[in-house]
């Protein structure tokens, strides 16, 4: 569909709003299931995956709960609750299987540009924290999904595996690691672009530099999508049977405009992020891992500090952060009016309720905003004691819009990803952040099941080709897990170290 003929009578089966990982995944799934359906993707920026899916705008961990300590809280009796970690990892396994199927079938032609083997590591110091990490290891290692995890509290082994973090470290204070060798670094920008390339090559229309201005429901259950060309100012309409709003932080305002009751009461709280980064070879060659620590006292889950190996455009980088920022924008390239305009009569109580109850978050944000450049590097020295200010530069990352959900007379801030769908299945959208991109495949399968309930059963055999474990908890099926894991590892070339990364266990000198 060209803009010239996209007048009031232009029709499409599916409109995807946004060209990030969620829309890219859903568009590909639909093209594989229903090749003849017409799909139109509308993106306000001039390129795909330029907001939260861009590798510089997210951590690229491919959240699999191997190293993120906020997924394994200690209970008052000292035991570790691993339920959230298992749930997140189960979701990541679904995405991993789909990516393997896509590589095997030519949907994703360049696996190494978006997926690289990088160990995932949890790091703590101090006797009490070491005790917690040992308990975490004992709780997780009995689960098939985490069975290969190692516990390391030996100074020499720590130094061998993480030479940069060992340099100038005072080992008189106990340290410990949970080491998961089979982690990955994911470039969700490259992954999104390849998925969109496949869908576009199979008939999907892409409209970049176009803004969705409004959505209105028609009497026949379809939607009229009002679109503006940001370059020419030309306005036009598209009629769609189904609309998916995958516009990242821009999803909430559009879902509010749709008027669906399911969106009522929801609000959004934008949190910015920044990382210190370096590509200096004398640093990148001595650190090959994503190392996550404990969040500062009173800080929200998205503030967990981590020192990460990233592989972006074939080059190895180190990123440390996140450092929180604040802006009323819902997108990195959004407007300062995004937050105030999102406040509606139906979510005002939710928004005010969060403002009154999340005092810890507000204190944390204020403290982060006051950090100087030297203070940021000082925080980095908890991980890399030898860090030198001049080796690192600041990267302003993307905006995260955390979900505010109605609770009682007020509201509660949620840290997670929420799929909203209308009761009739004609429109759906995605809100929230972590674990976000790495759960794109299960999230979009959820959209398909909820919005195309009449077709989902007929699609299931094809979906099981794409995700062999579909509908099965792999943590309950060790044999099936081993089969799909081995297959995925081979197809995704994760058994071969990337040229750009140093071998994780190579002997190192400090």
From Swiss-Prot:
It is an enzyme of class 1 (oxidoreductase). It holds the Pfam family Mqo. GO terms for biological process: tricarboxylic acid cycle. PANTHER family: L-2-HYDROXYGLUTARATE DEHYDROGENASE, MITOCHONDRIAL. SUPFAM superfamilies: FAD/NAD(P)-binding domain. This is Probable malate:quinone oxidoreductase. HAMAP family: MQO (MF_00212). It comes from Mycolicibacterium smegmatis (strain ATCC 700084 / mc(2)155) (Mycobacterium smegmatis). Pathway: Carbohydrate metabolism; tricarboxylic acid cycle; oxaloacetate from (S)-malate (quinone route): step 1/1. The gene is mqo. Its cofactor is FAD. Belongs to the MQO family. GO terms for molecular function: 2-hydroxyglutarate dehydrogenase activity; L-malate dehydrogenase (quinone) activity. Keywords: FAD, Flavoprotein, Oxidoreductase, Tricarboxylic acid cycle. InterPro entries: FAD/NAD-bd_sf, MQO. It catalyses: (S)-malate + a quinone = a quinol + oxaloacetate. Its EC number is 1.1.5.4.
